[in-house]
Swiss-Prot record:
Family: Belongs to the class I-like SAM-binding methyltransferase superfamily. Cation-independent O-methyltransferase family.
Phylogenetic placement of the source organism: Eukaryota, Viridiplantae, Streptophyta, Embryophyta, Tracheophyta
Catalytic activity: 3',5-dihydroxy-3,4',7-trimethoxyflavone + S-adenosyl-L-methionine = 5-hydroxy-3,7,3',4'-tetramethoxyflavone + S-adenosyl-L-homocysteine + H(+)
Originating gene: FOMT1
Disulfide bridge partners, by residue number: none
Recorded metabolic or biological pathway in which this protein acts: Flavonoid metabolism
Residues the record marks as site: Required for cosubstrate binding: 286
PANTHER family: O-METHYLTRANSFERASE
UniProt GO MF annotations: O-methyltransferase activity; protein dimerization activity; S-adenosylmethionine-dependent methyltransferase activity
Activity modulation notes: Inhibited by nickel (NiCl(2) and NiSO(4)) and para-chloromercuribenzoate.
Function (record text): Catalyzes the 3'- or 5'-O-methylation of partially methylated flavonols, but does not accept quercetin or caffeate as substrates for methylation.
CDD domains with a match to the protein in the record: AdoMet_MTases
Official protein name in the record: Flavonoid 3'-O-methyltransferase FOMT
Complex formation: Homodimer.
Length: 343
């Protein structure tokens, strides 16, 4: 019964966490060497609301029950005080100035949340929840709503930076490349990380024109706007992170064949994606991948996370001879599709 009751209010935690992030509560707490009371935290906010400390206390009390912050009672004044829990390492800015916080805000943004109200109708009547909500595909919408586009890109960019940093600790497949194309590379955050470790690589950041218009200039990186279903820039290797999962088999095959044509004989596509378990379990890794899969249902026609066998079938159908799964970073796997088996 208690679990069912918790499920009934499951939306509360992510929305409260979003508010805490937007108020900078976690950053404020993490910036201090000692525990902080709600009143002390409120003093760092641009507010004259006399009820702010009480509201902050209630927000943080909830977050403490999920081990996002720690809570204790200070003996000198009998007030609850708060400090960062271990997970705050990933919810507050790291030495690179990024965290998962932007992704939390993006995932709970009004634009994406509206999709869920159309999922039932999509199951019964067909169609895509996002399209039902806004009358157009998600990426067409973001081309028009630049504010939401920036929120989405910030979430993806920060998360990408953290994922690729972890990948670079173990994956060695970028060694020896002279050029690398990041297809769907957003504003270039991922490619920047790769080139910071392999500065001799010439980077091409390839995405839709409205995406790269906000991309900052980076040394060694050329931003190219275009449509990956028409053609892909040429390079020694092509990197794609969370791209295949947006599209159905037919669309993925078209994209992968364009990649195949853009590669030299010894070229390869390097894919970073979740790999779905054939049968899910209750582990965090399994939950993350199946959650991502259902999120995609609300946004894209035919998009989905895939099992290892499904990825291999796609690679072979597109003409790639080699297929190998390498390391994973926070459940994001690196998979290579080699144009020739000798690669």
């Amino acid at each position: 019964m208690l679990f069912a009751m918790q499920l009934a209010s499951a939306s509360v935690l992510p929305m409260v966490l979003k508010s805490a992030i937007e108020l900078d509560l976690l950053e404020i707490i993490a910036s201090q060497d000692t525990c902080m009371s709600p009143t002390e935290i409120a003093s760092h906010l641009p507010t004259t609301n006399p009820h702010a400390p009480t509201m902050i206390d209630r927000i943080l009390r909830l977050l403490s029950s999920y081990s996002i912050v720690t809570c204790s009672v200070r003996s000198v004044d009998d007030q609850r005080v708060y400090s960062p829990a271990p997970v705050c390492k990933y919810l507050t800015k790291n030495q690179d100035g990024v965290s998962i916080a932007a992704l939390c805000v993006a995932a709970q943004d009004k634009v994406l949340m509206e999709c869920w109200y159309h999922m039932k109708d999509a199951v019964l009547d067909g169609g895509i929840p996002f399209n039902k909500a806004y009358g157009m595909p998600i990426f067409d919408y973001f081309a028009k709503d630049l504010g939401s586009n920036k929120v989405f890109n910030k979430g993806m960019s920060d998360f990408s930076s953290m994922i690729i940093k972890k990948i670079l600790e173990t994956y060695k497949g970028f060694q020896g490349l002279t050029s690398l194309v990041d297809v769907g590379g957003g504003t270039g955050a991922t490619l920047t990380k790769i080139l910071s470790k392999y500065p001799t690589i010439r980077g091409i950041n390839f995405d839709l024109p409205h995406v790269i218009q906000d991309a900052p200039e980076y040394p060694g990186i050329e931003h190219v706007g275009g449509d990956m279903f028409v053609s892909v820039p040429k390079g020694d290797a092509i990197f794609m992170k969370w791209i295949c999962h947006d599209w159905n088999e037919e669309q993925c095959l078209k994209l992968l064949k364009n990649c195949y044509d853009a590669l030299p004989n010894n070229g390869k596509v390097i894919v970073a994606e979740y790999i779905l378990p054939v049968v899910p379990d209750s582990s965090l890794a399994s939950k993350l991948s199946v959650t991502a899969d259902v999120m995609i249902v609300t946004q894209n026609s035919g998009g989905k996370e895939r099992t290892e066998k499904e990825f291999e079938a796609l690679a072979k159908a597109a003409g790639f001879q080699g297929f190998q799964v390498f390391c994973n970073a926070f459940t994001i796997y690196i998979i290579e599709f080699s144009k020739n088996i000798s690669n």
